[in-house]
């Protein structure tokens, strides 16, 4: 995990533009991981352009808003796809028009579509992975309410409010860390 998280952050460092995708027919984890990563990167790198794209799902509109991105923005962008096991399920097929592609997921690896693929099937959700990614870089202090809220919604969604068998002690301990700043 340490090595791959460092590789992912090294790639993010190289790009001025990052576009984050997720799967079609999104659930709370798709939205939560996508928007959680977006909000975190915006706080960590305020000079970068960070976008979250895909078809909006009206029942999940309360989680957050998605961005409209022109085709030409993809030219020199890093694309990160969250919570999507295989390429045909990626919402917005422009994902392959970026300069580089990273996959971050918790579903069993059925399609290694990214140049960098991080899949942790032991994680309850991709939102949990994004939380671990943030804490790996000791960035807990830049997690604000917007980041914490969407990641929490993603974790709650994929664990069935912590009732499903994918809920681990690690999952339960995530929110016992120091409180996010307001």
Which sequence ranges carry the predicted segments?
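Residues at the starts of beta-strands that form the adenosine-phosphate
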Residues: 17, 48-49, 78, 100
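A structured phosphate/pyrophosphate-recognition subdomain
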Residues: 2-21, 36-42, 111-181
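Short, glycine/acidic-enriched loop or turn micro-motifs at the edges of active sites
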Residues: 26, 84-86, 108, 161, ...
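Generic enzyme active-site microenvironment
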Residues: 21, 25, 81, 103, ...
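Structural signal for conserved beta-strand scaffold positions within catalytic alpha/beta enzyme cores
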Residues: 52, 81, 103, 118-120, ...
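Anionic-ligand anchoring segments at beta-strand to alpha-helix junctions in alpha/beta enzyme folds, i.e.
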Residues: 19-72
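Short beta-strand segments
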Residues: 54, 80-83, 154
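Active-site cofactor/cluster-binding pocket
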Residues: 62-116
């Amino acid at each position: 995990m340490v090595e791959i998280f460092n590789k992912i952050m090294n790639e993010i460092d190289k790009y001025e533009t990052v576009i984050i995708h997720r799967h079609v027919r999104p659930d709370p984890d798709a939205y939560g991981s996508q928007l959680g990563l977006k909000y975190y990167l915006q706080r960590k790198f305020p000079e970068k352009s960070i976008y979250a794209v895909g078809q909006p799902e009206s029942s999940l509109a309360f989680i957050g808003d998605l961005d409209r991105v022109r085709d030409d923005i993809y030219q020199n962008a890093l694309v990160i796809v969250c919570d999507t096991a295989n390429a045909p399920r990626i919402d917005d097929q422009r994902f392959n028009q970026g300069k580089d592609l990273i996959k971050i997921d918790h579903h069993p690896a059925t399609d290694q579509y990214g140049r960098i693929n991080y899949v942790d099937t032991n994680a309850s959700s991709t939102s949990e992975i994004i939380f671990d990614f943030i804490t790996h870089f000791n960035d807990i202090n830049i997690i604000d309410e917007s980041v914490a809220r969407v990641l929490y919604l993603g974790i709650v969604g994929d664990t069935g409010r912590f009732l499903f068998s994918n809920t681990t002690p690690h999952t339960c301990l995530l929110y016992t860390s120091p409180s996010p700043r307001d």
